[in-house]
């Protein structure tokens, strides 16, 4: 328990320090990020999601896009500075609830089930900060908190550009966790673009939580 508490403190300290410096990842200003958001929204288009959970929302850059398809969004991030920035930048209706929380300690099912769960560029950091068992268990909790017929949108940068957290095989390991806990993979795409002067790929996966009948029929 003491070790887990220390991990939680280290996780918050890491992200809080980055956000206190500003938009480290250039989520608000990067053309690459805006193009990525557009692609993610295109995959989600055509449906209405009444109850949406975003895990690792940062300053709310993608959250602002989600609102157009959602009835209500709960957006979580571990950094108090990121959440303060998200709230300050949000000028829309009161359908978005930005909350400071450690998603690894958050009860995902308490307000569920969710029609859509979004986890973008988050699993790679969880895999670095926490044990593989902890991340695997977290994936199972995402699935359990999703409504039957609901969706999970997973996206993560990957490439051979020196960032060990985003090695392609590692990113696909996190994708496989979501498949193994019970989701059905409906769409997989690779989005490519340039950021920081290097070519980056994004593995995008749209999962659906089928009913037991659907799953048996699919097999």
Feature-to-residue mapping (PLM):
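A short SAM/SAH-binding and catalytic strip from SAM-dependent methyltransferases
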Residues: 116-132
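Class I (Rossmann-like) S-adenosyl-L-methionine-dependent methyltransferase catalytic domain
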Residues: 1-55, 59-110, 129-143, 151-219
